[in-house]
């Protein structure tokens, strides 16, 4: 379905409810620049570096896009997805069934669920929705739950230290969204709905989240304007 949620006036903050879940794949593909390109790149990188029969967990898996890409590249991987939206997981299960993918889906709050014994943890555009006081604790839990030499792949919307640069990049990004078919009204509506719900960090703050948790190094695998993917190594 096409994302037209913000064509009408909104009266609440953004949340991953049934309406968002029903249009999520269209929403993210038109809202995150080069989403398909970056998702495929990150999946291929993981497919190359993960050991045989590696255990992978996607936190905030939404409709399982990343997990399905991995399953297509490596059918030996043991895949799990965690999300707190029943509607998202319902769509994820339907897609996994359609593609014949064996994925364990878990309905849970990612800040409270147990994480242990994984070779890779994914969090694509997920940390930005975790309240800042809980974010460092979650990344620490991810680090603790990874096996030796495990990796943490996460993608985030970012801001810059320079406020003028941030403003300019956001303007370019909103032009991009308009080119994807969103009206200026829809863009403004969503921006308002996301206020204080999506809290972005700078590139340095995101790197430090991982480094302070104990990761040895953090590489960047993709970047466009204010969107970025990181790969942290335990």
From Swiss-Prot:
Q: Which Pfam families match?
A: Methyltransf_25
MF GO annotations = carboxyl- or carbamoyltransferase activity; S-adenosyl-L-methionine binding
The record lists the catalysed reaction(s) as: prephenate + S-adenosyl-L-methionine = carboxy-S-adenosyl-L-methionine + 3-phenylpyruvate + H2O
Any one GO BP annotation for this protein: tRNA wobble uridine modification
HAMAP family listed in its UniProt record: Cx_SAM_synthase
Question: What is known about its subunit structure?
Answer: Homodimer.
Give the matching PANTHER family.
CARBOXY-S-ADENOSYL-L-METHIONINE SYNTHASE, TRANS-ACONITATE 2-METHYLTRANSFERASE-RELATED
Q: What is this protein called?
A: Carboxy-S-adenosyl-L-methionine synthase
- Say which species the protein is native to: Campylobacter concisus (strain 13826)
* Gene label: cmoA
